A protein has these predicted regions:
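Signature of N-terminal electron-transfer/Fe-S-associated modules in redox systems
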Residues: 1-188
């Protein structure tokens, strides 16, 4: 089994019994009971499982949790949709914009859109068609979602969204070859 350390929604997590091929999606849903991250296609096509990942260099990316293995987040900060709002419950600007612009209908895809938009918001990115190209919606249509992204882009980035990179230095991680029952993973 593999031992890893990471931040989850701003909280340090140490896991010493995760299989090297365990996906972040399954870990979030099955072990942490964070079910906002959805399993849509389980192939990286729909974006319903998008999570925010900050690596030790401070690079922030929106990644598909269904394609991300747990050892790949060793030493990183992960934010699921549950960790996008301020810890006091105040919605993130993209969450407020999605509500006010009616960017959700059935809601299944909404968490992935919100996380992708929050990553773009943190980076100051404004090419929303490109940013959201990895997220699919079958009911709302994309116009209200794009309007929400545009509306949120001028809002200040909430302070808790910048805190993860500073907290990563406190994690103790080891890069190693791990093996478990014919499963191997090397974290480069």
């Amino acid at each position: 089994m593999t031992k890893i350390a990471f931040l989850l929604n701003g909280t340090p997590v140490n896991v010493d019994d995760v299989a090297p091929t365990q996906t972040v999606l399954d870990y979030l849903r099955d072990f942490e009971k964070l079910c906002g991250t959805k399993e849509g296609c389980n192939e990286g096509d729909c974006g319903a499982c998008t999570v925010m990942v900050t690596d030790p260099t401070g690079q922030v990316r929106a990644l598909n949790a269904c394609l991300l293995f747990m050892p790949q987040i060793d030493g990183c900060a992960v934010r699921s949709v549950e960790g996008i709002a301020h810890p006091d419950g105040t919605p993130h600007p993209v969450q407020s914009a999605m509500i006010s612009h009616h960017g959700s209908q059935c809601g299944f895809c909404t968490p992935g859109f919100v996380v992708s938009m929050a990553v773009a918001h943190a980076q100051g990115a404004q090419d929303h068609d490109q940013i959201l190209a990895g997220n699919l919606c079958r009911c709302t249509g994309y116009a209200p979602i794009i309007r929400a992204a545009v509306a949120a882009q001028s809002a200040p980035v909430p302070p808790h969204m910048h805190a993860d990179h500073g907290l990563l230095a406190q994690l103790h991680t080891e890069k190693a070859v791990e093996a478990a029952e014919d499963q191997r993973y090397y974290h480069p």
